C-alpha cells in the first residue's frame, strides 16, 4: 500500500507541475500577443528615411525578362 501511495503522490506532483507550466506558458503567450498587437510595422518612416528600391517603369521587357533574371541571380 505504501508503494502505491508514493506513486500516486509522485503522479500528482507531475500533474500539478505540468498544469502550472502549461498555464504559465499560456499567459506568457497572451502577454506577448498583447505587446505586439498594436505594433505597426508598415507605418511610413519618419525622419530622413531613404527609399531603397524604385521600380523602373521605363525598362523595356516584361514579366518573362524578370523571371529569367530571377532564375539567373536567385533571390
UniProtKB/Swiss-Prot annotation:
> According to its UniProt record, where is this protein located?
Cell membrane
Residues spanning the membrane: 12-32
Topology relative to the membrane, per the entry? Single-pass membrane protein
GO terms for CC? plasma membrane
| Presence of the UniProt keyword Transmembrane helix in the record | yes
Main location as per UniProt: membrane
Task: Note the InterPro entries from the entry.
Answer: DUF4227 (IPR025321)
Q: Which UniProt keywords apply?
A: Cell membrane, Membrane, Transmembrane, Transmembrane helix
Source domain of life is: Bacteria
Annotated protein name in UniProt:
Uncharacterized membrane protein YqzK
Amino acid at each position: 500500500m505504501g508503494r502505491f501511495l508514493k506513486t500516486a503522490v509522485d503522479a500528482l506532483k507531475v500533474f500539478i507541475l505540468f498544469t502550472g507550466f502549461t498555464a504559465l506558458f499560456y499567459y506568457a503567450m497572451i502577454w506577448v500577443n498583447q505587446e505586439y498587437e498594436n505594433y505597426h510595422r508598415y507605418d511610413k518612416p519618419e525622419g530622413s528615411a531613404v527609399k531603397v528600391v524604385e521600380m523602373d517603369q521605363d525598362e523595356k521587357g516584361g514579366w518573362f525578362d524578370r523571371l529569367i533574371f530571377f532564375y539567373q541571380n536567385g533571390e
